[in-house]
Amino acid sequence: MGSGVPRPSLTAREMFMAWGRILAGNVPMLSIEITRECPLSCPGCYAYGDQHLGGGVTLSKLNDYRGHALVDGVLGLVRKHKSLHISLVGGEPMIRHRELSRILPALSKMGVFTLLVTSGVIPVPPEWMKIPRLRVAISVDGLPEHHDIRRKPATYERILKNIARCDVNIHWTITRPMLARAGYLEEYVAFWSGRPEANCIWMSGYTPQIGEQSAEMLTPEDRAALARDLPELAARYPKFLFHPGLARAFLHPPKNPRDCLFAKMSANYSADLKSRVEPCVFGGNPDCSQCGCAASTGLHWVRGVKVAGGLRVDHFVGSSVRFGAMMSRLRSRPAKPTRWTPSSPTRGTGDALVQIES
């Protein structure tokens, strides 16, 4: 039941809407790991890494919520930070599908854009497709020869059954083994472009931690080849969202979290709804020089877009962050965005938001 009109998870127009939130001293985006539970055991999964939450505790050891406590907790965080966009991740968020059936309509009524990221291991209710401002993204990492091994039991067969009569985004994390066979990338894009359930396809490159050595990691040559070849695929398959501007941003990612617009504009909570994921959604010590995050890449491109004369989005964001920090200090808000305070620490589990710097 796909509409045939590709819709990214967050558009440039929605980013401009976030400007007012920043000026008011609020963080425009939230990411919440709404459960510690997941039936998958994916190689390289950052969420369950020992350093994901700074080394003191792991996601699987946190006390998470369910029922009314989870519903109230998620909605409470959104009200607290007055965010425009929220990503609900995990763990496997569909483990809490009963709570999501209450959370998602409530977020929509609050005017919040929601991206729900799931493996597709649990059926997605078709009635959710009628919820305004909701997008559901299914993580499909390669063709069955790789995906069904990496992400079992969320196999292709199971995903296709569980997204029937739905309208979803397909999120694809590209790893090095997928580049070993000629034609692999186009075969993937062609398959999902032909599925009526797929509204659009967006990709990330595998992002390693500093010092990591794994089979999933892309080499500099791999990244250059992807930046060259993927825009050509997107030109032939309109559902695949990857234009030359994104290719340039992918090839030259932000140097560090302080240079990353996505890291600046997002506060990230783990499953206890208190612990913070720092310095970005990956947690731990991500190797920014090899970042492949779709959100980071997209916003890294957006920051260079000209909006008035010679001024770019980045000029407005930098000035807005400084103004928002001042407004937050004047109001002495308990939930002020401490990432906007240069002297604040970048990791912590208290009530202060992640540190945002321009």
Descriptions of predicted regions:
Residues 32, 36-39, 254, 282-285:
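Processing junctions and N-termini across compartments
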Residues 80, 130, 194-195, 285:
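Alpha-helix termination/capping residues and helix-transition junctions
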Residues 2-127, 315, 319-320:
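Conserved alpha-helical substructure of the radical SAM core
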Residues 44, 48-51, 266, 286, ...:
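Secreted/processed peptides and extracellular or luminal domains of membrane proteins
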Residues 38, 42-45, 260, 280, ...:
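Short cysteine clusters
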Residues 41, 82-83, 132, 196-199:
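Short loop/turn motifs at secondary-structure junctions
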Residues 57-58, 110, 134-267, 272, ...:
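Radical SAM enzyme [4Fe-4S]-AdoMet core and its adjacent flexible, acidic
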Residues 26-28, 272-358:
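Flexible mid-to-C-terminal extensions adjoining Fe-S/redox cofactors in radical SAM and related proteins
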